[in-house]
């Protein structure tokens, strides 16, 4: 503590001016500690335990505790902001992709749409498996429950796609199950499952978050524009429910909570998976647009 805060804590006879300067020095250094990352947060505990030896009065203790709490909360929130800044260009590329533009202006080839929806159903099955593994590795009971519910929800969405769209396409469930994963779909889902099986809980969240978050943001953009094609409009309407918004917000809140406990190296790993699967999100739309097939 003395090495961190210097002479300000050695002073035993504080006058008003010296007290203010000393408190400013302490608060500034606490700010540096908190902004430095989760691995330094144990120093916050040392500071709080040192209040008595530092002879800091009750009012100033309250101020420092308030400041610490606020900074820790802000640090968590800013992590999700950092994440979004990492993928802003990717997200802009998704919004400008001809698949999405074709949805909203009605020009998208229906074969591309059909291909996409089928592959999306196949994706959801593997995504559900990934979420089940996330639940198994969750360090908190509430997260175990949440991801098990999300896994079940993904399977329900797959079933709803069959009931609403696949019947229109004249497809049976066996037709979907016998459809092979397109190259991009196989790569994306294989990556998710590899992370889920081999990485810690925080990295799994980094890998699955873009599917939640980008899909939500894209959905809001699509809903605001609509489509002249009734089939596409019906699909866009699936984005409009408030229930999905609550699901995404819960995962974002979880991300902020996780970030407060991560070391810098762990945050980098989180971001690496987050950016990679965000790229896969763009590739998935592109896969649908091109009706991607194996080249050989």
Language model segments and positions:
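Active-site-proximal alpha-helical scaffolds that flank and shape metal-associated catalytic sites
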Residues: 142-246, 275, 279
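Short alpha-helical hairpin
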Residues: 84-108, 127, 252-261
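A non-catalytic, amphipathic alpha-helix used as a structural packing/dimerization or gating element
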Residues: 115-126, 149, 153, 269-276, ...
């Amino acid at each position: 503590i003395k090495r961190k805060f210097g002479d300000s804590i050695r002073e035993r006879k504080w006058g008003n001016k010296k007290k203010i300067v000393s408190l400013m020095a302490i608060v500034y250094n606490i700010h540096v500690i908190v902004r430095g990352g989760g691995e330094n947060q144990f120093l916050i505990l040392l500071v709080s335990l040192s209040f008595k030896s530092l002879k800091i009065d009750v009012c100033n203790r309250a101020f420092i505790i308030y400041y610490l709490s606020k900074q820790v909360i802000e640090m968590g929130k800013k992590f999700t902001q950092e994440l979004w800044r990492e993928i802003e260009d990717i997200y802009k590329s998704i919004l400008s992709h001809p698949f999405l533009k074709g949805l909203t202006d009605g020009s998208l080839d229906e074969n591309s749409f059909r291909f996409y929806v089928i592959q999306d159903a196949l994706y959801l099955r593997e995504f559900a498996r990934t979420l089940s593994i996330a639940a198994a590795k969750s360090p908190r009971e509430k997260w175990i429950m949440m991801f098990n519910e999300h896994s079940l929800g993904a399977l329900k969405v797959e079933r709803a796609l069959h009931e609403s769209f696949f019947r229109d396409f004249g497809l049976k469930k066996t037709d979907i199950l016998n459809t092979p994963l397109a190259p991009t779909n196989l790569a994306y889902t294989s990556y998710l499952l590899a992370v889920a099986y081999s990485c810690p809980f925080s990295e799994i969240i980094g890998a699955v978050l873009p599917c939640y978050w980008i899909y939500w943001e894209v959905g809001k953009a699509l809903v605001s524009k609509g489509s002249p094609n009734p089939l596409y409009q019906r699909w866009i309407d699936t984005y409009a429910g408030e229930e999905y918004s609550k699901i995404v917000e819960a995962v974002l809140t979880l991300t902020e909570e996780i970030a407060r406990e991560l070391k810098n190296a762990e945050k980098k790993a989180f971001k690496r998976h987050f950016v990679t699967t965000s790229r896969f999100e763009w590739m998935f739309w592109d896969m649908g647009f091109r009706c991607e097939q194996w080249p050989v």
